[in-house]
């Protein structure tokens, strides 16, 4: 196949399935028990994956040491997001329709505290020191700070528009809030909202370069906008070939991967120094959720029920793995042992072995998919925590 040129977003690479290093077919699902027994690492990851079951109204705690559900933790509401603290044995779940935050103890796998912060919420982020939890609320339109020691609302900052996305800088001093009309910075110590950095239909936002720059996806104009945080001004607009719906940074933060409507591709952006679009790599069908290991990029294709795996170094697709029905979220464990794929329609989590993909030593090409674990109704978010 010829390689098309001339796209605004840079080079486009096309790959035939026959040219992939390996493609795992759906019939490998029948071989999962054998494959898992032969390929599971001798030392399993010691920890849990906490999975938010949106329609089940619960968190499923999956013991990653034995690859089985340890407990279902019922919640009052439909969870959409779960975050694990690194410094404390705690996990936080958000139920947007009730505007509530739920705290779960990792050692007991039980709900410990619950706090209603708004009538409706959208998303949440932990502060770097894990002393505060910031909740972005739809009703009322506000950024809300929760003090985690007392588990009470510390302050609320009203917002001019219905918010969409939230990001918190690594130093914990600045937040960014996007909306369908603009993107703003928030001085967290002063509890002050900046003037709009830019006008447009913004979606995902991400701090970069130790919080010195802000990357903002303008979905209305298919732009990646880069702003200076200190100067509160635009650095550049980068036209891209997809609507910027999802962001994912490489571990070294040297590459930003973008997926969204408009093209079956992943756009690769180099955000350091002079930000520029690098490559546009064809991958999957209507690609969506992403996550990375040190060397690999995992990209979910909800419509086709598979995950495309790319080498970050070469930006080539090296595998396509069928995982289930409607994969919509990916989380790689901190030790790069497992990639967890949440399948919303089939209500399960597919566990991929990252070393099996990286080393490519399995002659039958079935080692990557270790097992599929039923976890509940419509799993949509996961957080992994070592113990």
What do these predicted ranges mean?
Residues 13-15, 23-24, 29-387:
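Predominantly soluble domains enriched in secretory-pathway, periplasmic, or organellar proteins
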Residues 1-24:
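Secretory targeting signals
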